Amino acid sequence: MARYTGPSTRIARKFGEAIFGDDKSFEKRNYPPGQHGMAKKRGKKSEFAIQLMEKQKAKYSYGILEKQFRGLFKKAAASKGVTGEILLQLCEARLDNVVYRMGIAPTRRAARQIVSHRHVTVNGELVNVPSYHLKPGDKVAVREKSKSLEAIDRSLSNSSHVYEWITWNTAQMEGTFVSVPARLQIPENIKEQLIVELYNK
């Protein structure tokens, strides 16, 4: 299945929450999409449907396709620790996500474009792979020739997010992936254990 590129508000309404961040359109219409959205009731779902919905929410939130997401789950399952928590930590360590968390881009979708269009470096080297896995201590910066881009400047000016596991120097337009975030430091409203149960069926 191809990556979804349609209206983010429609997907947010499907899950009943603003999974892509602040969304004024969602706030106005926070009911299911479709002609009869207002009349639809979020009725009782089966266990499988609930687990599947949670997996879809995570994939949409991070902008990850099924093959990549399953690969991350396998890596998490093979690691020591709580599988669901490690899965989210792997998602958070992706370059596109960190670019978003640092405020270089207003959304993860925009962050993927910024990375793909060669506007970001990691430890001084140009990296254009959104799924690139960062390690603690890695330095992420806006490429010198891209520092004057209006879209990046506007995003940084509007960013108010502060995370303990990353640092950002506005003057140098450079930040550091200090550490892998603990589960409590990840703000996403995702019930990762449901995803683990789904994949373990």
Swiss-Prot record:
Gene Ontology CC entries for this record: small ribosomal subunit
Gene3D superfamilies referenced in this protein's UniProt entry, alphabetically: Ribosomal Protein S4 Delta 41, Chain A, domain 1 (1.10.1050.10), RNA-binding S4 domain (3.10.290.10)
Biological process (GO), any one: ribosomal small subunit biogenesis
Stretches assigned to the S4 RNA-binding domain: 93-153
Keywords: Ribonucleoprotein, Ribosomal protein, RNA-binding, rRNA-binding
Keyword Hydrolase: no
A GO molecular-function descriptor: structural constituent of ribosome
UniProt cross-references to Pfam families, sorted A to Z: Ribosomal_S4, S4
UniProt keyword annotation of Methyltransferase present: no
SMART domains, per database record: Ribosomal_S4, S4
HAMAP family per the UniProt record, alphabetical: Ribosomal_uS4_B
Family of this protein: Belongs to the universal ribosomal protein uS4 family.
Record function comment: One of the primary rRNA binding proteins, it binds directly to 16S rRNA where it nucleates assembly of the body of the 30S subunit. With S5 and S12 plays an important role in translational accuracy.
Listed PANTHER family: 30S 40S RIBOSOMAL PROTEIN (PTHR11831), SMALL RIBOSOMAL SUBUNIT PROTEIN US4M (PTHR11831:SF4)
Subunit structure as annotated in this protein's UniProt entry: Part of the 30S ribosomal subunit. Contacts protein S5. The interaction surface between S4 and S5 is involved in control of translational fidelity.
Protein name: Small ribosomal subunit protein uS4
Organism the protein comes from: Flavobacterium psychrophilum (strain ATCC 49511 / DSM 21280 / CIP 103535 / JIP02/86)
Gene of this entry: rpsD
